[in-house]
Structure formats: C-alpha cells, structure tokens
Amino acid sequence: MCSIGEDDFGDEGGVHAMKEESPLPEGATTIEQEICRKCNDQRAVLKLNQKEPQCRECFLHYVRHKFRASLGATKIVRRGSKVMVVFNGAPENVVMLDMVRHGLEQEAFKKLRVDPVVVFVGEDFIGRDQEGYEQSVREKVQILRQFGFPAYYTVLGAQDSCSIEDNCLAGKFIGDQDKVTKVLQGIKSITSKQDFIVQTRKQTYKAIAKKLECGYIFLSSIGLELAKTLLSDVSLGRGKSLALDIAFCDDRDEERKIIRPMRDLNPEEIEYYLKFAENQLQSVAIVDPYLDKSSLQNLTSKFVDGLQLSFPSTVSTVFRTGDKLGAEKIPTCDNQLEDDDHFATLFDKSLKLESNAEEPRKCKFCHSALDYRDSTTLFATEFSRMVSSRINVQLSHEEIIESTKLMEQDACKLVNAELEDDEMRQLKRELCHACRNILVDFDGK
C-alpha cells in the first residue's frame, strides 16, 4: 500500500516527491579491478544502475532469467506450443531471438519448450523508394539467418507469407503495400497515420499467426516502449484497451494471444547483452518515417525520454502503474473482422456491415471493448467542437440559447453514432473513439 497521502500531490502530481538526479551516463558503467558480487570469482565488467558489479556470465544469466521468469511465472504459454516470433531487426528484437535460441539449446530441465516460427514483417516500404526498401529487406534477412530458425516474410497489411529463402522478397507483396500506402496517403494527420500503422500491425500479426497455426505471438517490446504506449493510448482515447496494449499477455483474441516476454528489460540491459553475448549479434535501428513530424505519439515519446533523464524511475513508475489497470473481457466471436475482411475495407467502403438490433461490443478494427455509449467525456469533446464552429459574436442571447440546445442534441447523437447517414452510422457504431478518429481523418478517394 502506498504511504503517500493524496494531500502530498499538488498540481505537479508526484513529481515533487521524486528525487531529481543528475543525468547518468548512457548504459551501464564499465568498471575495472572489481570482482563480481554474484559469483565472487570472475572479474566484473559492468555495473548497471543500482545493481552490484557483475561479470559477463552472471550478467547474461541475470538477463536471461528475467526473460524466462516472465514466461514461467504466468504459465500462459503451454509446453510444446507453436509460437510465432515477430522479427524486425531491432536490438531488443535480436536479443529476444537469441534468448529463444539459447533456451532451446539448454538441457532437458532448463529447456524452453516451445516450437518457434519466425516471421519478418516488413514495413520499410513506407517512406522509402523501392531500391532502399529492397536493400533494407536484404540486410534484415541476413541478420535473421544467423539464428537458423524456420522463417517467413510478409509485409504490413498482408494476410499471407512466404519463406525468406524465396527470391525477390521485396516484390512479392506489391498489392498489399499499395493498399497500405494508399490509405496512409489519404489520412491527413501524422497522429492518425501512426495509430493506423500500430493497429494494422497487430491485425497482420494475428492473420499470419492463424495461417501458420500459431497460438502465441512473441513481441520484443521492452519497458520504455510500453511506458510510451501507455501514455500515448491515454492521449489517443484508447483507455479501454490500454491495459492489454502493455500487458504481458494481450488475450483479446483467445486463439492467438500476443505475449511480451521482454517487458521487464530496459535499454541498458539490451545494449550490454548485445556486447557480451556468446555469439556476435547484428541488429539495425528501426527508422520511423514519421519520427521527425508533429504528432501526439512523438510528443509523448519525447516527454518520457526527457523526464527519464532527470527522474530515472519515470519509466518504471509509468509502466508499473499500467500493470494495475484492468481490461474488460469480450468474447472473441463478437464483431471482429472476418477472414475475408481486410483493414482496407474500412476505408474503401467495401466492408459488409450487418444491420442488427444488438449493440456491438467490440471495435471492428482494434478489437477493444466499446464504451462510447452516452460517454460524458466524448460528449464534452463533441460539444466543445460544435461551440467553436457554430457560435459567433453576432448571435443574440436567444439565438445562442436555442443553438446550445441543438448542439447538445447533436453532440449526444454524434457520440452514439446516430447523426450520420445509415452506412456511416452503422460503421461508427462498430468502432471505438480512437478508430473513429482515424476514419474521420481519412479523405482518400
């Protein structure tokens, strides 16, 4: 139980209660002529923040134990399960693949008992020319081959995959790439573009996992990334799905669960794992094509990074707070994209909607629980938007009162998706607030 009273928190929240520390050097501190405090035998090679000096073997054991402990403590992943491991070539992603390989090579008692299938989901066609895209694919495939796992290749938005040994991988999914590119070109704001990519990415993972008959999807998200995701979800209006977006297990789809076994690791541990691992591991930095643009996600990311420099416990505090949040369970069969549906159908008006009297319970796009009905928060947002567009100084007092009554009615109808024509009304009924914003922001032809 927290011992800090509510009165201790003013307008600045709990920031004033956090001890500000001078910026620490990046990574752990390499030390000399010290003995490892774990084994008391080998020479220490590093000292992580607030940790004792460690030798190379003890450090690798410590990091790998955190990975295995997250899987063992929850007992969600069953023995012998076929697991789809998502690959993108990032440092934390390469570390996860090496940990999986190391676990499979252990003796019977310590062996990681899963059947991994690696899937490389290409996204580099966004914001790059064909030559740059092909070069990026070749580079990442070369990194992937160092692990020796059975591996497949696909792209963002696709629903099928091919072996990485096939020729001309970058040219196999031109149609799927064009669909994603067309939608992104039609979305006006960078915030909605980035949100669309995140939601489509999850949809792609689940579609490929179903094709490969995998019940679990391993992602390499670490604590820093998940802390940023938590705050970004708040700013985007995805509070209903926030808990599952950062949880160890996202079980919105009970047949294909998303697992985040790297969530307890931090960037320093990733950096030094790559340095001290038995095998020389190659990785690449993931380049976000919209990183230098203005968006809610980019602003949140910079805010967290900046606060972390002065208050090193920021990420841990935000991340662990998210662990205390709950999420509503919705049956998988309710209102999600069917096998023959595709994300693009939401934007090209070809999605088939079933008109029925039942209230939808799950978002058609992101599959989070719907909670917009009679929402006072959304009502205030829509009403404020209407006041800005409809009220002007030339209106009389009586006209303002009459207009206010109409705006209240219209705002309520907008929140409950009752104001538009039949087709748009039915579509908005089946989307959460954040996914509605993506659709509203889309003006593609």
Swiss-Prot record:
Task: Spell out the residue ranges making up region: Disordered.
Answer: 1-26
- Signal peptide feature range: none
Q: Which InterPro entries match?
A: CTU2, Rossmann-like_a/b/a_fold
Among Gene3D superfamilies, the record links this protein to:
HUPs (3.40.50.620)
Q: What SUPFAM superfamilies does this protein map onto?
A: Adenine nucleotide alpha hydrolases-like (SSF52402)
Return one GO MF term.
nucleotidyltransferase activity
A Pfam family reported for this protein in Swiss-Prot or TrEMBL: CTU2
GO CC entries = cytosol
Name the residue ranges with Acidic residues bias.
Answer: 1-11
Sorted keywords for this record are: Cytoplasm, tRNA processing
Pathway, per record? tRNA modification; 5-methoxycarbonylmethyl-2-thiouridine-tRNA biosynthesis
What are the recorded Gene Ontology BP terms? protein urmylation; tRNA thio-modification; tRNA wobble position uridine thiolation; tRNA wobble uridine modification
State where composition is biased (Basic and acidic residues).
13-22
Q: Where is it localised? A: Cytoplasm
Give the main localization category.
cytoplasm
Q: What does this protein do?
A: Plays a central role in 2-thiolation of mcm(5)S(2)U at tRNA wobble positions of tRNA(Lys), tRNA(Glu) and tRNA(Gln). May act by forming a heterodimer with NCS6/CTU1 that ligates sulfur from thiocarboxylated URM1 onto the uridine of tRNAs at wobble position.
Which family is this protein grouped under?
Belongs to the CTU2/NCS2 family.
Specify the protein name. Answer: Cytoplasmic tRNA 2-thiolation protein 2
Q: Which organism is it from?
A: Aedes aegypti
Output the lineage of the source organism: Eukaryota, Metazoa, Ecdysozoa, Arthropoda, Hexapoda
